[in-house]
Design a protein with these regions (language model features):
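Short, highly charged low-complexity linear segments
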Residues: 20, 116-117, 121, 140-145
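Short, flexible active-site loop motifs that bind/organize anionic cofactors or intermediates
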Residues: 13-16, 46-47, 88, 117
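The conserved cystathionine-beta-synthase
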Residues: 16-35, 40-41, 88-106, 113
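Residue-level signal for alpha-helical context at structural boundaries
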Residues: 24, 44, 116, 145-149
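Tandem CBS (Bateman) regulatory domains
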Residues: 1-12, 52-88, 94-103, 124-149
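Short hydrophobic/aromatic-rich motifs at helix boundaries and adjacent loops
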Residues: 25-29, 67-72, 111-116
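A glycine-centered beta-loop-beta connector
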Residues: 30-33, 38-55, 102, 110-125
Length: 149
C-alpha cells in the first residue's frame, strides 16, 4: 500500500499553525483535534516545521524554572491531569487487536496488565517495528519459495 492510498482513505486535511502562533495555541490545537503534532507553516502554507507533544515536553523540561514560575499548574499533582480511564491489554493480546484498539482509540500507549499488576507497556512504535519484522519475514519466505519452486 502506498502513502497515496492511505491518504485517499483518511483524507489529506492537515492541521496547521502559522509560525507566529503561540505555544498555548499549539497546545489548544493538539487537544481540540486529539492529535500528537501540528504542522507549522509560513507564507502561503509552506512547511517550515512540526511541533509535537514531545517537543513541548522537551521545552518544558529545558525551561522548568520559567514554566514553574509562570504556571501555577506546574505545582499541582499530576493526578489532576492524567487520563483516569486507561485502556490496557494483556500479554495474550494479539498485535492485530492492539493495532485496532490504538487506531480506534487514537492512543499510542497501552499498559500491559496481568492479574491487576502492571507488567509492561506497548507503544505504537513497538507495534510498527513488530509488523515491519513480520512483513520482512513473509517477504523472505515468499522469495525463498519462488526461488526453490
Amino acid at each position: 500500500m502506498t502513502v497515496k492510498a492511505i491518504l485517499s482513505r483518511k483524507g489529506s486535511t492537515v492541521v496547521t499553525l502559522d509560525r507566529s502562533g503561540m505555544l498555548s495555541d499549539a497546545v489548544k490545537i493538539l487537544d481540540e483535534h486529539q492529535i500528537g503534532a501540528v504542522v507549522i507553516t509560513g507564507a502561503e502554507q509552506q512547511l517550515v516545521g512540526i511541533l509535537s507533544e514531545r517537543d513541548i515536553v522537551h521545552t518544558i523540561a529545558q525551561n522548568a524554572r520559567v514554566f514553574a514560575s509562570a504556571c501555577r499548574l506546574c505545582d499541582e499533582p499530576v493526578e489532576q491531569f492524567m487520563t483516569r480511564k486507561v485502556e490496557t491489554c494483556t500479554e495474550s493480546s494479539t498485535v492485530y487487536e492492539i493495532m485496532e484498539r490504538m487506531t480506534v482509540g487514537k492512543f499510542r500507549h497501552l499498559p500491559v496488565v496481568e492479574r491487576g499488576r502492571l507488567v509492561g507497556i506497548i507503544s505504537v512504535g513497538d507495534v510498527v517495528k513488530h509488523r515491519l519484522g513480520e512483513m520482512e519475514s513473509e517477504s523472505n519466505a515468499l522469495r525463498e519459495y519462488i526461488l526453490t519452486a
